[in-house]
Amino acid sequence: MIGGLFLNTLSFVIVSNHVVNNTANVHHIQQEHVIVQQTQIVSARTQNYYPEFSIAVLFVSFLALYRSTNFKTCVGILMFKIVSMTLIGPMLTAYGYYIDGIVTTTVLALRFIYLSYFWYVNNRFEFVLYNTTTLMFVHGRAAPFMRSSHSSIYVTLYGGINYMFVNDLTLHFVDPMLVSIAIRGLAHADLTVVRAVELLNGDFIYVFSQEPVVGVYNAAFSQAVLNEIDLKEEVEDHVYDVPSGINCHR
């Protein structure tokens, strides 16, 4: 794929040299005619050179920066990057496409070295695997951390009464208050559960933050849904009456 994008970047130079070599043994009038044609060919090829080279650089940059939250996809992309950096890049250079091979190898290698720094500091290979500089760790399980608006650090995880989903993994627990999240990389923070929001379908949204949650408000619901929520809360409220025959002061 990379070779297909790069194969035409220097081909106009080969065409130019071929035309120049063939015009040496041609009559003066024919030579002028061939030179005019050569100039038109080289000019047309030169106009196409910059868009092709720009697309090639953008593609390699996209490949170096692309990230996914799916574990299997990340493994496949990482293997393709390693093959491109160690095999395709040198192969392009060996076949004479020096710019193509150098750009491919250099961009991917610089990105790998940059991520390897976070791998070395935090001793976790997931920085290279997920192609990101910030990860969140939930009881040893790593997942990409998506920075929220205004650079505030908080995490919301979806789950149930005794489990929550961490990326494509399921974390089971006894008490949600015992679950903590460690943010490592460009950001450094330790988060705990500050609120467990119960949804109408019985699922939960767990909010992790450094600041306590004061309250959660219902909004954007129809009156019928609000009435159903109030009815559910009334059913769950239990009032225990003390029998008159029991002496509470004893």
UniProtKB/Swiss-Prot annotation:
Q: Which PROSITE patterns match?
A: COV_VIROPORIN_3A_CD, COV_VIROPORIN_3A_TM
Q: Which cell locations does it reside in?
A: Host membrane
Chief localization class? host cell
Report the coiled-coil segments.
none
Q: Which UniProt keywords apply?
A: Host membrane, Membrane, Transmembrane, Transmembrane helix
* Organism of derivation: Canine coronavirus (strain BGF10) (CCoV)
Any idea where the CoV 3a-like viroporin TM domain is?
40-130
Q: Per its record, how is this protein called by name? A: Non-structural protein 3b
> Could you give one GO CC term from the UniProt record?
host cell membrane
Residue ranges spanning the membrane: these are: 46-66, 75-95, 101-121
Question: According to its record, how does it sit in the membrane?
Answer: Multi-pass membrane protein
**Which function does this protein serve?**
May be a virulence factor.
> What InterPro entries is this protein classified in?
a/bCoV_VIROPORIN_3A-like_CD (IPR046446), a/bCoV_VIROPORIN_3A-like_TM (IPR046445), Coronavirus_Orf3a/b (IPR004293)
* Residues covered by the CoV 3a-like viroporin CD domain: 134-213
Write out the similarity annotation.
Belongs to the coronaviruses NS3b protein family.
